[in-house]
Amino acid sequence: MKKIVVLGSGMVGRVMAADLAADFEVTAVDVSPANLDGLKKTPVKRLRADLSDAAAVRDVVRGCDLVVGAVPGSMGFATLREVVAAGKDIVDISFFPEDSFLLDDAARKAGVTAVVDCGVAPGMSNMILGYHAARMSVERFECYVGGLPFQREFPFEYKAPFSPADVIEEYTRPARYVENGHVVVKPALSDVENMDFPEIGTLEAFNSDGLRSLLATMKVPNMIEKTLRYPGHAGHIRALRDSGFFGGEEIEVRGRRVRPLDVTSAVLFKHWRLHEEDDEFTIMRIIVEGEENGRPKRYTYGLFDRRDRTTGFSSMARTTGFP
């Protein structure tokens, strides 16, 4: 039986591990005993290790046939680098800020296949665009995606269905999109627009850095990705960000050195924590426009998925982690 190691056993990682265990020998690795305990009732082997330690990463992947990366974005690139150095193929969902193509030469030399950003969007969205790009001349690609709770609680009306640290990263990382063949960079949370969805009503969409590898792999003159939230969310987050609450530089408070980001994260995570009983959904709309067989063509895809109450798997974990 093939052996798979899943690095990270958070809200999405442990669901992938449990699903894969039906057909493979799976080991889940995480530094958190609480995260690993979520797999107690599954056949998944559990291993506690600090994946911020390069030597530990190489050690835990030794002897496996495939690695699945599901660590927080802040650790994603370094973890990917060590897996590539160990000569292991990897499918990764980490939302890291670094350019994955910096490891392209190393992966080629090691004979490693690394599929990165393999989630909903980026991930499924890339595959849909690739499918159409092979069959038509694509002129425009638009992707709108988000994961939200059904229960709206003031003021943020949001719960984090994956690493909360990666959520804040979405709100602070500059957003890149393509307009008339040129890459445009704008602040995250910019260009807010309202969109209507039959399944849930009106949501707001704003710029986020979700095109990722598409910026390098696809020659489409117009491409954009936006994140979906309940109306008003972007304004609340912009107020925090622009006031310095996401700052990474230490400041002194009552004789102690602290980072505003760490304090804000601790406060927000209490409100944003997605509990097992919280009903949530994932929603996505993809639009592909161009010329096919000499005629203008427009394709629209819609995804709407909600928590599986039987298994307890969140919608974001299902849509991200299931093949």
Where do the language-model regions lie?
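Conserved Rossmann-fold cofactor-binding substructure of NAD(P)-dependent oxidoreductases
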Residues: 51-63
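C-terminal catalytic/substrate-binding lobe primarily of soluble NAD(P)-dependent oxidoreductases
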Residues: 134-323
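Rossmann-fold NAD(P)-binding glycine/threonine-rich loop
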Residues: 93-116
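Conserved N-terminal Rossmann-fold NAD(P)-binding element of oxidoreductases
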Residues: 4-8
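Helix N-cap at the beta1-alpha1 junction of Rossmann-like dinucleotide-binding domains, i.e.
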Residues: 33-35, 97
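N-terminal Rossmann-fold NAD(P) dinucleotide-binding loop
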Residues: 13-14
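Beta-loop-alpha module in the N-terminal Rossmann-like domain of NAD(P)-dependent dehydrogenases
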Residues: 66-83, 96-100
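Conserved acidic E/D residue at the C-terminus of a beta-strand in Rossmann-like folds
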Residues: 28-31
